Regions:
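Hydrophobic alpha-helical connector segments
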Residues: 59-88, 134-143, 278-307
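Short, structured motif recognition centered on aromatic/hydrophobic residues
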Residues: 4, 16, 54-55, 89-93, ...
C-alpha cells in the first residue's frame, strides 16, 4: 500500500504497473497476488484505509466537544489537517480515486460518508432539530432538516476545494480553508417549506440532442458517446471513430489525440452550457430569479445530453490535468453568477462563491452518476436554494427555488 501511495504521487495512478509496485515494495510477484487480484484491487484496499484514517481525524476533532459550530469547524479542520500531514495519501483518496472507475469512486465516497454524517449532525443541532446525542436522519425522512442531497453538496464542496489544491500541488493553501468553509456551511438552515420538484418538463428543445455543426463537433460528440459506453480510460480511437461515424484518418485531420479531443469536448460543453445560463438569467426580472433561471438552464442542458454530461462532469476526473482545469473553469463560472449577491450580503465569506460552485458541481456529479436525465433536472431547486441562501436567507431563497412569491433582501 505504501508503494502505491508513493508511486501514484510521483507518476499518477493510471501509469502504474504491478511490476513497478512489486519492485518498490520488494515483494515477490506471487506474494502480491496472494493479497490482491491486481493493481485496482490494491487501490480499493488502500483508499479504504486512507479514507478511514481521514474520517478518524475528523471524528476525533469533532468529538472534543463545544458548540455545534465549533465541532463542525474542528471536523473540517481535521480533514484538512490530515490532507496537509499525509498529502500523497490524501491525493490518492480525494483526487486519483475519482479517475479510476466506479468501484474506486464508491470506495473513496465511503470515507466521505462519515464526514457527511458529522456535517448533518452539526447542522441539525444548529437548526434546533437535534441534540449532540441524536443522529439526524440521512435518508430524507426528517422534513425539518436539510435534505441528503444538500448535505452531500455542502460536504462535496469541502472535498472539491481540498482536492483542487492537492491536485495543483498548492497544499500551502489548505490550512486557511478550514475556518471560512466551516462558517459558510454552519450558516445554512433548512428551507421553511419543502423544496418542490421542477414542474412539468424542460423548456421545449432543451432535451434535443446537440446537432453538430461540422465534422469536428461530430467527433467531439463521438468522443462523449464512446466514453459514455466504456469510460474514458478504456475508450480507444476506434471507438470514437465508430460512434462519430467517421474514420481514424478523419479524426487525425482534426485532433492529435483522444486527450486533445476530450479537452475540446469539455470546452464545447462549457461554452454551450454557459450560453444557456446567460440567456436564461438575462431574461429574469432580478438577480435571485436570474440565479434560479440560470441554474435551471444548466440542469436542463446536462439533462438533455446524458453522454456529454457523463463525459465532462464525471469522466473528466480520469482525463488529466488540462481537462480538469477546464472543468474547474466551468465551476468558477457558476461562482461568477453569484457575485451580485455580495452587494446584498457583504459579510458573506469570500470563499462562498467557489464553495457554492463546487456544491452545485457535486449535485450534478451525483445526479449524473445516478442515471442523469430527469435526475439532473430535479436538482435545480436544491441548487438554487444553496446558491441563494447565504445572500438572501432561507425564506426568500426557498420562495425563489420554488418559484413562488417575490424575493426579499436578507434582513
Amino acid at each position: 500500500m505504501a508503494a502505491l501511495v508513493v508511486l501514484a504521487d510521483e507518476r499518477g495512478y493510471q501509469s502504474l504497473r504491478v511490476e513497478d509496485l512489486i519492485a518498490l515494495a520488494g515483494v515477490a510477484r506471487g506474494a502480491f497476488y496472494e493479497q490482491f487480484r491486481g493493481r485496482d484491487d490494491l487501490l480499493l484496499a488502500t483508499v479504504t484505509e486512507i479514507g478511514e484514517l481521514g474520517l478518524r481525524d475528523a471524528a476525533t476533532a469533532y468529538k472534543r466537544g463545544g458548540p455545534a459550530e465549533v465541532r463542525l469547524r474542528a471536523a473540517i479542520e481535521g480533514v484538512i489537517g490530515f490532507a496537509v500531514a499525509q498529502t500523497a495519501a490524501a491525493r490518492l483518496w480525494l483526487v486519483d480515486a475519482y479517475g479510476a472507475g466506479p468501484a474506486a469512486i464508491d470506495t473513496a465516497e465511503q470515507g466521505l460518508d462519515g464526514i457527511r454524517a458529522l456535517v448533518a449532525q452539526a447542522l441539525a443541532e444548529l437548526a434546533g432539530e437535534a441534540t449532540p446525542d441524536e443522529a439526524p436522519a440521512l435518508d430524507g425522512t426528517d422534513a425539518a432538516a436539510l435534505s441528503p442531497d444538500a448535505i452531500r453538496a455542502l460536504t462535496g464542496a469541502v472535498h472539491r476545494l481540498i482536492a483542487s489544491r492537492l491536485r495543483r500541488r498548492h497544499e500551502d493553501e489548505l490550512p486557511s480553508l478550514g475556518r471560512p468553509l466551516a462558517a459558510w456551511i454552519a450558516s445554512y438552515r433548512p428551507p421553511p417549506t419543502p423544496l418542490r420538484r421542477p414542474r412539468g418538463h424542460a423548456t421545449p428543445g432543451t432535451d434535443a440532442r446537440i446537432a453538430p455543426r461540422d465534422q469536428a463537433e461530430r467527433i467531439l460528440l463521438g468522443v462523449c458517446d464512446a466514453i459514455y459506453d466504456k469510460g474514458y480510460t478504456a475508450t480507444t480511437l476506434a471507438d470514437v471513430a465508430a460512434r462519430a461515424s467517421t474514420s481514424i484518418r478523419t479524426f487525425y485531420a482534426h485532433y492529435e489525440s483522444k486527450e486533445e479531443a476530450f479537452v475540446d469536448a469539455v470546452d464545447l460543453a462549457q461554452v454551450q452550457s454557459y450560453a444557456a445560463v446567460l440567456a436564461a438569467s438575462r431574461r429574469a426580472p432580478d438577480w435571485p430569479q436570474a440565479v434560479r433561471a440560470g441554474l435551471t438552464a444548466l440542469c436542463n442542458y446536462f439533462a438533455g445530453e446524458p453522454p456529454l454530461a457523463e463525459a465532462v462532469v464525471v469522466e473528466v476526473h480520469a482525463a488529466g490535468e488540462q481537462a480538469l482545469r477546464r472543468h474547474e473553469e466551468s465551476t468558477a463560472a457558476i461562482g461568477r453568477l453569484l457575485e451580485p449577491g455580495y452587494e446584498l450580503a457583504p459579510d458573506t465569506p469570500a470563499i462562498a462563491a467557489e464553495a457554492i460552485g463546487s456544491a452545485i458541481d457535486t449535485l450534478l456529479y451525483d445526479a449524473i452518476r445516478a442515471g442523469g436525465g430527469p435526475k439532473v433536472r430535479a436538482i435545480a431547486p436544491t441548487a438554487t436554494y444553496l446558491a441563494l441562501f447565504p445572500f438572501i436567507g432561507s425564506t426568500a431563497a426557498c420562495e425563489v427555488a420554488n418559484d413562488t412569491g417575490q424575493p426579499r433582501r436578507r434582513g
